[in-house]
């Protein structure tokens, strides 16, 4: 479908454009001298948690807090770049007595956003745009936007299935992909040397099974070993994952060692850029399996990425998940995210229907233009 108008994007403010939670934590540490200091990872949920981090809520009722909230690093450049791609709206929840302060700060810090594009209120489901970008899970779940996108923060790590990003650059790449999905495009070339093929889909869709068969039959493909946080029921090293602790995983992300990371069903998954580059340097193709978030991260860092969504009947996926040797909580998280996963298929370059294994594999081989 061709469109003669720009995409519309609604942006949150708190913890997306301006530092809210982390700033409040900083103020709390300065005022109360906590030992050890409160960290952002202690804000592991929305609202009050019954822990010491609840002290930050005292700052949310002070005008000075909203007057001095710092703009997040890179936020101004992000809005400037986004304004060239889409029509920007602000959708922000703020107490009524501080709305004037919030509006003034937005106009001062982000002059690209027109005053009549600023909406203040908690009912973000009343805003209809192509894309919503927010860090609050409930806003993403209730959004009427065609593409609600979650900004990953410690308080939404448990969320699964919905499209989520870790950085502004990843979001801008997703906007490009969404824009391209609206336009008629010629069939893109597959497997130009060297290339990356990503099989996308929820847990239990069959993507790993298809990738394994490709790796077995076509030696020109190689899979980088990914990193994932430890699951008490799956701690053995294998050919797909290195298992690390959540603390180690976070350190790898924050140090930049991982160029791509995502959370799925409460577990972290990530890749090291040098692992991908070493395969490409050998003249081989990379094949890997990821959720849509990981796939978009790859597209941010590499130009030669083809995404293929593996679609399977929901009943079959649930049966596969229930057979997994994992915790009940893990299974529940994966099942709850299935509908959101299916919505993301339009962002992929191709779709393979996994109704029957051999037929799905044959379709994948056809898409990749491999010799049978």
Residues of each region from the PLM?
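Conserved phosphate-donor/acceptor-positioning beta-strand/loop module used by diverse small-molecule
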Residues: 287-291, 301-322
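Active-site neighborhood of HAD-like aspartate-dependent phosphohydrolases
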Residues: 2-55, 194-199, 204-220
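Substrate-recognition element of Asp-dependent hydrolases with the DxDx(T/V) motif
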Residues: 66-70, 75-106, 285-286
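Substrate-recognition "cap/lid" segment bordering the active-site pocket of phosphatases
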Residues: 91-142
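ATP-dependent small-molecule kinase phosphotransfer cores
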Residues: 49-64, 228-286
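Acidic, Mg2+-coordinating phosphoryl-transfer loop and its flanking beta/alpha structural elements
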Residues: 132-169
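Small-molecule kinase domains that catalyze NTP-dependent phosphoryl transfer to phosphate-bearing small molecules
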Residues: 295, 323-367
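Phosphate-binding P-loop
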Residues: 187-194
């Amino acid at each position: 479908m061709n469109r003669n108008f720009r995409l519309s994007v609604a942006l949150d403010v708190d913890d997306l454009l301006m530092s809210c939670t982390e700033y409040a934590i900083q103020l709390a540490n300065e005022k109360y001298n906590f030992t050890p200091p409160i960290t952002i990872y202690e804000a592991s949920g929305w609202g009050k948690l019954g822990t010491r981090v609840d002290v930050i809520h005292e700052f949310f009722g002070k005008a000075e807090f909203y007057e001095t909230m710092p703009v997040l690093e890179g936020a101004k450049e992000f809005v400037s770049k986004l304004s060239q791609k889409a029509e920007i709206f602000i959708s922000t929840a703020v107490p009524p007595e501080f709305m004037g302060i919030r509006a003034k700060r937005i106009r001062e810090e982000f002059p690209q956003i027109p005053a009549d594009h600023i909406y203040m209120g908690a009912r973000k489901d009343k805003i209809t745009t192509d894309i919503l970008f927010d860090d609050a899970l409930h806003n993403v779940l209730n959004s009427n936007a065609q593409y609600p996108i979650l900004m990953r923060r410690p308080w939404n790590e448990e969320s699964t299935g919905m499209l989520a990003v870790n950085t502004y650059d990843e979001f801008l790449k997703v906007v490009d992909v969404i824009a391209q999905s609206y336009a008629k495009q010629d069939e893109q070339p597959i497997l130009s040397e060297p290339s990356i093929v990503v099989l996308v889909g929820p847990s239990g869709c069959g993507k790993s099974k298809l990738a394994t068969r490709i790796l077995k039959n076509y030696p020109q493909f190689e899979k980088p070993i990914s990193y994932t946080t430890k699951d008490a029921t799956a701690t053995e090293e294998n050919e797909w994952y290195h298992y690390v602790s959540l603390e180690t995983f976070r350190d790898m992300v924050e140090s930049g060692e991982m160029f791509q990371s995502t959370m799925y069903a409460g577990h972290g998954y990530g890749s090291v850029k040098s692992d991908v580059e070493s395969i490409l340097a050998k003249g081989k193709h990379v094949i890997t399996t990821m959720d849509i978030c990981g796939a978009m991260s790859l597209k941010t860092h590499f130009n030669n990425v083809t995404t293929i969504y593996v679609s399977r009947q929901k009943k079959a996926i649930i049966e596969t998940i229930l057979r997994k040797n994992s915790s009940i909580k893990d299974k529940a998280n994966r099942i709850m995210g299935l509908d959101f996963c299916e919505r993301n298929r339009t962002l992929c370059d191709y779709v393979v229907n996994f109704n029957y294994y051999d037929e799905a594999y044959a379709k994948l081989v056809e898409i990749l233009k491999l010799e049978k």
